[in-house]
UniProtKB/Swiss-Prot annotation:
This is Elongation factor G. PANTHER family: RIBOSOME-RELEASING FACTOR 2, MITOCHONDRIAL, TRANSLATION ELONGATION FACTOR G-RELATED. Residues 8-288 form the tr-type G domain. It comes from Rhizobium etli (strain ATCC 51251 / DSM 11541 / JCM 21823 / NBRC 15573 / CFN 42). It comes from the Bacteria. NCBIfam families: EF-G, PRK12740.1-5, small_GTP. The gene is fusA. Gene3D superfamilies: 3.30.230.10, 3.30.70.240, Elongation Factor G (Translational Gtpase), domain 3 (3.30.70.870), P-loop containing nucleotide triphosphate hydrolases (3.40.50.300), Translation factors (2.40.30.10). GTP binds at residues 17-24, 86-90, 140-143. GO terms for biological process: ribosome disassembly. CDD domains: EF-G, EFG_III, EFG_mtEFG1_IV, EFG_mtEFG_C, EFG_mtEFG_II. The keyword Lyase does not apply. It is found in: Cytoplasm. Transmembrane segments: none annotated.
Amino acid sequence: MAREYKIEDYRNFGIMAHIDAGKTTTTERILYYTGKSHKIGEVHDGAATMDWMEQEQERGITITSAATTTFWKGRDGKMRRFNIIDTPGHVDFTIEVERSLRVLDGAIALLDANAGVEPQTETVWRQAEKYNVPRMIFCNKMDKTGADFYRSVEMIKTRLGATAVVMQLPIGAESDFKGVVDLVEMNALIWRDESLGAQWDVVEIPDDLKAKAEEYREKLIETVVEIDEAAMEAYLEGNMPDNDKIRELVRRGTIDVKFHPMFCGTAFKNKGVQPLLDAVVDYLPSPLDIPAIKGIDFKTEADIERHADDAEPLSMLAFKIMNDPFVGSLTFARIYSGKLEKGSSVLNTVKDKRERVGRMLQMHSNSREDIEEAFAGDIVALAGLKETTTGDTLCDPLKPVILERMEFPEPVIQIAIEPKSKGDQEKMGLALNRLAAEDPSFRVKTDQESGQTIIAGMGELHLDIIVDRMRREFKVEANVGAPQVAYRETITRQTEEDYTHKKQTGGTGQFARVKIIFEPNPEGEDFKFESKIVGGAVPKEYIPGVQKGIESVLSSGPLAGFPMLGVKATLIDGAFHDVDSSVLAFEIASRACFREAAKKAGAQLLEPMMKVEVVTPEDYVGDVIGDLNSRRGQIQGQESRGIAVVISANVPLANMFKYVDNLRSMSQGRAQYTMTFDHYAPVPSNVATEIQAKYSGQK
């Protein structure tokens, strides 16, 4: 079967935003207008197509990013293929956003016109910056009370440090919002309410907006000509670019991430969605417009690139594992190069295992269609893969490559969990392992001392939903303990330790001597190992044993047994024995060496500090600040946002449990907050003593 759509007609994009900015509703409208849905699903009815897990429909939030393929006819009459990924906006599910952005070519950032740039908008924006994803902005909810398009434009500059190129102006606001002014064509689009937004009239720009439209068109042209010398010169000589040239320059600037075209509308009231779809075609990149994916040659470790071309060897990235009630485990993958046929064998280069593609599916939210083959640029779901996990590379076994890996955040909260009936122990283990395979930010471990099962994740809601899914999907009822903070330990000063491991038990003995400098790692929280051995005091083949020995102890620090961060170790001297030395002997020596050194190196307890933003009516500001201070919070600042006040603070996670209930009663339900992990910080000594006393007995 040949390729149906040329690769230049593909648009792989995601929709990203703060929770409640209207992402799922916008996606529903896109599916409706592109003909994939016959009835519009509303989130508040629990009927949205993209939100297919039961918990999503109950809570009205999106948890997993559903991938959907649909089609749209551009302004030129040509059909385009859209692969859309709907991502969650709740901070506990940031991992979903991160891995979606990794495999997308472009994104639409949604803003709530009333709130503008919110904390989670900043978080997902930063993630998109990290992967250099071209973005457009859609200022949604223009029909909402307090909607202010121009303030949102300003906030993009002040809060995100980004340049928005305004492409449309709103006609009216709040309940009077009727349509938009198109600043390229210089006309107005007014939607007909009775047609569910499917039809609109193109009319002249209203008189009261003509001057503003001229002003903003001028700004638009000024910004876009800056990226092209010839266009800039022509403009300075008084020659204005024509409309096609403006679109071409906007496209170039968007793909190069120089600026972000901005549109407005209200997805819920069905206004402004079709011009947004035209803009996806006009301004977001096809797989051919973005740089080739980088990787390393599996055999030679040389840097290589794979281009978006069916003729190149197959390479794809598994970016999500999902448990499907009908098909079993599904692996979502983005094909970067080559083509994939059903039944073919691929190599997982991260695990060095071959996998056979049993079935290949194209997903529409939670319905599916079997396909025989897929091509460069496609996003597909594969059934039958046994070894593959999120972030793995799958490729042609004859031309193996390892694509750039994804990075996943460390969990900040953990709870003990046990099945309500002893007979469910095995079932619970199976369920948790399945869920951990789907979500790399969720971890499961067994506490060595107590034998308890511990689950760890990105927040209370994250773990609530895991427990909930276990009950619904795997029929396992569980008891959960109180949430516990994922503390860490570090060292604060340099120390040098000389340790000799000697054991003689008849026959071959064990001997290893190491001299190591331990100090805080100036480069960050990771462990860094260096060898400065000269003259063969420790043979080269034993040095990996020294590193492995230290790493094995980092999982349990000297104060209360928490994992250690930010340690640097430098091996400077040692000794070996021709017969009795081995890698294992050096592993044992370095392990004991670090245990001794850690006691002398000023071990310190660290706790996760959270960036908290509270949006509250002015009446409650004093109470909110007083309460945050009582939680050991450090107030970072406050600003007005409309009639509300936004308070920013850094607060230890340990003091934020059940904060939502406190805030609700303090503000009579009128204040809201968001919380994201910010950094690890030293625990004050009086609090550290309590924590050590509590945990030392458990470890």
